[in-house]
C-alpha cells in the first residue's frame, strides 16, 4: 500500500477501522469472536479482562492477539504458580543500587511496570506479595520503586484461570477490578472444529500500522469517552436492572458502586467506538459480561439480559401492553356487537314429538327468501375443509330444516350464499342461547339473522365510531413501533454485540409488528363488515 493511502487509513475514524482490526485479529480463531470483541473494547477503554475456562482453549492466544492491536506496544506475559516471586513479575532488584546507594530499586525494563499490555495466566495462584502490588497498580496506575512513584503505561490487563477465586480467599478486591469477565469453552460447532484441526495454529506476527491503535490517539479517546452522554431512558433501564439484581441475586452477586461506575464507562466506550455520542440501549447488553460473579449468577444474568433485549431495550414491553389493551377493547366491542345482533334462541313453553328439546330459533322476523333464511357470519370464517382459504360471509338454510334443528351436535345442511355446494355445518348455542357456527378450527362464530327490519343506524353508528377510534390508536402505536425499530436499525451495526443478541431484539419487533398488523386488519374488516350485516 502506498504511504499516503496507509496514512489516510490510519487517520480514519476508529469506528471505521475497528471492523478491519477485529477481522485481522480474529483470523484463524474459531468461536472466539466474542472474546476478542470484548477484550478489544476493554483495551480501548483501559479496563481489565478476566478469561475463565478450562486449559487449552486459546486464552493466552487471545491475549497475544490483543497485544497486536497496539502499535509498537510493549508486552508482558507470565504464568503464575504458588512459587512465583515479585521479582519475576515486577523486575529483579538492582544489586548496584543496593550496594552504592542503599536503595531498594527494581530493574523494571521488560517487566509489568513498563508494559502496555499485560497477560497473567493462572492469576489466583499468585502469592499475596504479587497480588497486593498488582492491586495497587490496577487502582492507581502507579508503581512504587524505592522511594518514588512511577506511572504505569498499562492499557490492558488480561488475566486468566480455569477457576474462580475461592470464597474467603482475600481475593475479592482484585477480582472486583476485573471488569470484563468472559466465559470460554471448547470449540462446539462441527465445521469450526474441523477448520481448527486443519489450521496450522500460527498466530499473527504483525498487523499493518494502518489498522493498529497508536498511543496519542488512545489517550485522546479516554477523554472523549468520558464526554459520551447517558440518556435518561438508558439510565432508567440501568436502574431497573440494578433493582432486579438486588432483589434476585443480592446474596450471590454483589455489584459494588465502583463496578457499576466502571461498567457504565465501558458502555460509554462502546457507544463512542461505534461512532455515537450517547449510549444506546444495545450498549447495555454488555452488562452481561461485567456484572456476574460465579457460574450461577452468570446464568441468571444472561436470563435477565435476554429478557431485557426482548422486552425493555426498545420499549417492547410497553408497546406489547398497549397492543394487549387495544385487543381487549376490540374484544369487548365484538362481544357487545354479538350480544346485540347475534340470533338468540328461546326455550319453548311446551313441546311435542320425539325430537323436541325445548329450544326454538325465532324466524318470524326473518327476511323472506322463499323457503330459505340467511345468516350473516359476524366475522367471515373458513368453513369448507376442501377450500380452507375461502372465507364464508353468509350461510343459507332451509327454513323447515332449521325449525326442526336442536342442539344435540347434529350437523345441519346449508350452503354459502352464492355457492350451490351443500355443506354440513355444526351449529351450537352458548350459555345465553346465542346461535353460532363452528369454523374449521372449531371456534364459535356468531350468526346474525337477516331480518325484515334493518338494524337501526343509532345502533351501528357508535360501533363504527369506536372502531374508527381503535384504528386511530393502533395507527399511533404503529408509528411508535416504527420509530423504535428505526432506532434499533441505526444501532444494530454494533461492533461489540454478537448477532445472537441482535436477533433477539429483531425477533421481538417481528412479533410485535405481525400482531399489530393482524389487529389492524381485523379492526378494518369489522369496520367494513358492520354495514354489510344489513344487506
Segments from the language model and where they lie:
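Canonical AAA+ ATPase core
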Residues: 96-101, 117, 122-130, 138-212
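Terminal-proximal interaction/regulatory segments of ATP-powered molecular machines
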Residues: 299-535
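Walker A/P-loop
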Residues: 40-82
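Conserved C-terminal "switch" segment of AAA+ ATPases
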Residues: 4-15, 28-29, 182-255, 276-277
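Conserved alpha-helical scaffold flanking the Walker A/P-loop in AAA+ ATPase domains
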Residues: 38-41, 95-118
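Conserved NTP-binding/hydrolysis module of P-loop NTPases
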Residues: 81-100
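Pre-Walker A (pre-P-loop) alpha-helix and adjacent loop at the N terminus of AAA/AAA+ ATPase modules
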Residues: 11-54
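C-terminal helical "lid" subdomain and adjoining coupling/linker elements of P-loop NTPases
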Residues: 227-229, 243-314
Amino acid at each position: 500500500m502506498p504511504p499516503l493511502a496507509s496514512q489516510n487509513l490510519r487517520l480514519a475514524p476508529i469506528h471505521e477501522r475497528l471492523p478491519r482490526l477485529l477481522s485481522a485479529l480474529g483470523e484463524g480463531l474459531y468461536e472466539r469472536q466474542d472474546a476478542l470483541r470484548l477484550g478489544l473494547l476493554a483495551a480501548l477503554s483501559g479496563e481489565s479482562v478476566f478469561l475463565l475456562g478450562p486449559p487449552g482453549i486459546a486464552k493466552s492466544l487471545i491475549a497475544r492477539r490483543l497485544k497486536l492491536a497496539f502499535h509498537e506496544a510493549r508486552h508482558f506475559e507470565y504464568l503464575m504458580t504458588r512459587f512465583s516471586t515479585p521479582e519475576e513479575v515486577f523486575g529483579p532488584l538492582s544489586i548496584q543500587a543496593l550496594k552504592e546507594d542503599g536503595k531498594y530499586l527494581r530493574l523494571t525494563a521488560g517487566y509489568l511496570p513498563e508494559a502496555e499490555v499485560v497477560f497473567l495466566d493462572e492469576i489466583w495462584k499468585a502469592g499475596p506479595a504479587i497480588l497486593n502490588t498488582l492491586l495497587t497498580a490496577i487502582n492507581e496506575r502507579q508503581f512504587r520503586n524505592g522511594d518514588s512513584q512511577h506511572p504505569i503505561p498499562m492499557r490492558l490487563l488480561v488475566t486468566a484461570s480455569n477457576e474462580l477465586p475461592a470464597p474467603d480467599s482475600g481475593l475479592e478486591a482484585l477480582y472486583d477490578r476485573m471488569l470484563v469477565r468472559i466465559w470460554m469453552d471448547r470449540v462446539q460447532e462441527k465445521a469450526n472444529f474441523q477448520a481448527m484441526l486443519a489450521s496450522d495454529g500460527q498466530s499473527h506476527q504483525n498487523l499493518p500500522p494502518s489498522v493498529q491503535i497508536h498511543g496519542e490517539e488512545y489517550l485522546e479517546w479516554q477523554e472523549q469517552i468520558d464526554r459520551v452522554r447517558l440518556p435518561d431512558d438508558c439510565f432508567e433501564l440501568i436502574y431497573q436492572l440494578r433493582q432486579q439484581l438486588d432483589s434476585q441475586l443480592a446474596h450471590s452477586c454483589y455489584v459494588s458502586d465502583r463496578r457499576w461506575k466502571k461498567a457504565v464507562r465501558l458502555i460509554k466506550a462502546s457507544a463512542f467506538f461505534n461512532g455515537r455520542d450517547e449510549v444506546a440501549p444495545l450498549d447495555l447488553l454488555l452488562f452481561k459480561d461485567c456484572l456476574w460473579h460465579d457460574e450461577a449468577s452468570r446464568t441468571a444474568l444472561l436470563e435477565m439480559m435476554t429478557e431485557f433485549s426482548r422486552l425493555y431495550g426498545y420499549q417492547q414491553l410497553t408497546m406489547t401492553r398497549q397492543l394487549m389493551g387495544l385487543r381487549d377493547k376490540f374484544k369487548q366491542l365484538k362481544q357487545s356487537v354479538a350480544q346485540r345482533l347475534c340470533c338468540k334462541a328461546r326455550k319453548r313453553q311446551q313441546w311435542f314429538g320425539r325430537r323436541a328439546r325445548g329450544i326454538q330459533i325465532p324466524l318470524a322476523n326473518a327476511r323472506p327468501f322463499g323457503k330459505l333464511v340467511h345468516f350473516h357470519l359476524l366475522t367471515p370464517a373458513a368453513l369448507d375443509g376442501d377450500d380452507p382459504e375461502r372465507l364464508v360471509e353468509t350461510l343459507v338454510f332451509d327454513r323447515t330444516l332449521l325449525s326442526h334443528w336442536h342442539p344435540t351436535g347434529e350437523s345441519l345442511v346449508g350452503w354459502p350464499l352464492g355457492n350451490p355446494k351443500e355443506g354440513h355445518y355444526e351449529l351450537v348455542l352458548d350459555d345465553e342461547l346465542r346461535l353460532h357456527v363452528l369454523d374449521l378450527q372449531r371456534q364459535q362464530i356468531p350468526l346474525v339473522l337477516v331480518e325484515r327490519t334493518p338494524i337501526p343506524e343509532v345502533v351501528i353508528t357508535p360501533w363504527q365510531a369506536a372502531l374508527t377510534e381503535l384504528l386511530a390508536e393502533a395507527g399511533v402505536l404503529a408509528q411508535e413501533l416504527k420509530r423504535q425499530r428505526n432506532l434499533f436499525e441505526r444501532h444494530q451495526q454494533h461492533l461489540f454485540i454478537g448477532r445472537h443478541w441482535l436477533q433477539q431484539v429483531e425477533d421481538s419487533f417481528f412479533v410485535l409488528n405481525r400482531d399489530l398488523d393482524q389487529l389492524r386488519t381485523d379492526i378494518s374488516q369489522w369496520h367494513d363488515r358492520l354495514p354489510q350485516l344489513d344487506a
